[in-house]
């Protein structure tokens, strides 16, 4: 419930806690495991307001991010090298520099006003900024965000897109064994309902205007691509749904032999974090973690909410109008139906249709999941120096390190180029 704005006093506030494993829990840990940490929350009240706005229970949030597996990974990882996912896929954790945490905090009042005013924003939700320090160790800063790609279906491809090209190819970055592809790897353009595209372009503009005003650049469009009727494997191994020489009917995903529910997905059984349940009455209970020696946390079985069909809640074209005209919708960017067209690059860099082996263009019925992530980089000294260095070697139009105004304009142009209106009356 939105009750007030985030103030400058809120932004400066911090809370410190000490996390200490119980004696019984230590017995179950490998030798040499760090068992005591200093934990710090930044702008705790401000982030609580965001959690309330997004219907995030604070106790469940803390149980998801504060467990021995997460603490171990956070205290041994380097900046930018890793994403951590909660077992229920709700939260995405990224390690940041101290300067990036500062940027998040400084923009928090304006960011909060924006996500409250525009409930269909594409911006990832920042639920908390924290630091953790093993006793005698090095402090690690991190942010907890919404997982834009949270889904009960397998993603055939996942992209991190900036609208630039220099250095924008896959560097084997993975989230839960899924390779994150980049701009150079993108060989599709997407056709979506014209109303959906209009809403997408409009919301992207509003979100980019906020980021531009806050001096933010180097953000990305996270895009998940799920082919209807497929299960696991690469989209490159699939037969196109239709091409220019076949009838343009869509595949019946419910009858496809490839259909499989998420509960049977081996990819989702290997998680980087696990959820926990509290036991405040038993501080030294087995497998507990003590926060200020008051609250203890113990592992609980993972919850599975997979339906019989991953497409039961798929947005159909008959109700697209209601969805995209409702400015209070918080699910915009999730489960957008469309068609993916395989494309290549012409000599001038323009997008051209790519021929399949049978001679027609490759098309796929897809579900799209998208949002804007990494909204914590300002155009400071480090990025200005990067711009000077790279612009000597490459065109400034192709590099990521550019002024926020130029970055915003290029990003919006890129989104409008890869998402096109689907005006095919037969689809």
Curated annotation (Swiss-Prot):
GO BP annotations, alphabetical order = phosphatidylinositol metabolic process
Q: Which residues form the PIPK domain?
A: 1-419
What the entry lists under SUPFAM superfamilies is as follows: SAICAR synthase-like
* GO function terms (MF aspect): 1-phosphatidylinositol-4-phosphate 5-kinase activity; ATP binding
Q: Where is this region: Activation loop?
A: 379-400
Q: Where is this region: Disordered?
A: 247-287, 334-355
Q: What is this protein called?
A: Phosphatidylinositol 4-phosphate 5-kinase 10
- Which organism is this protein's natural source? Arabidopsis thaliana
